[in-house]
């Protein structure tokens, strides 16, 4: 959890620079990638984080360090964002990397907006999340810090390589395993889904069933969860025959599993406990 100083710094910086990032169009892709790279560098260099967040150090010195870090080939807006971040006060040194990552995700969202792919990316992230729920061994390897990042990325693309995912979806999925940031893989994907949902002004409701939902079921679910959340929702329907029947519904981090397979598993646990 970020301290008050960091929350203020992050909010003010993003409020100030979000319009420029939003208006950067196709360049938002490049900026987002550069900020992800910077996040990774900061995460692996505590001395650099300290140098960039030291309140006793002149801002000009910290900006000079940033210029040395990113070089002359970085996008001007990347430099402007980082210069703004180092000029602010942070509760913890690691919070500047969090802010850089937030800007990186914003860049990817604005690029998705620019290419009319925002909803598509949100749905694909939810599909990836749902698929990994049934692959515990794979997802554990995707956030295994003892496995080299290159190997984790290779594993990811062996999973999604044949999927017709948007380039933004693939980049975000790659970022989540390339730079773990002390998070479980599904935790990061859910965080990204939530950010896209807030960005679009609607919630993503992932419904897993053994057979496709009917139009009437989708309409009913939209009405129920729109009323529950207080804003529009999108139903992401996932068909998984292994659940046998019933529904598993996920909204953000909240999961309601009333599938037949879940009930059978619960029954098995109950029988074992009383045996």
From Swiss-Prot:
It is a peripheral membrane protein. Keywords: ATP synthesis, Cell membrane, CF(1), Hydrogen ion transport, Ion transport, Membrane, Transport. Its main location: membrane. Transmembrane segments: none annotated. It holds the Pfam family OSCP. It is found in: Cell membrane. GO terms for cellular component: plasma membrane; proton-transporting ATP synthase complex. PANTHER family: ATP SYNTHASE DELTA CHAIN (PTHR11910). F-type ATPases have 2 components, F(1) - the catalytic core - and F(0) - the membrane proton channel. F(1) has five subunits: alpha(3), beta(3), gamma(1), delta(1), epsilon(1). F(0) has three main subunits: a(1), b(2) and c(10-14). The alpha and beta chains form an alternating ring which encloses part of the gamma chain. F(1) is attached to F(0) by a central stalk formed by the gamma and epsilon chains, while a peripheral stalk is formed by the delta and b chains. This is ATP synthase subunit delta. It comes from Bifidobacterium adolescentis (strain ATCC 15703 / DSM 20083 / NCTC 11814 / E194a).
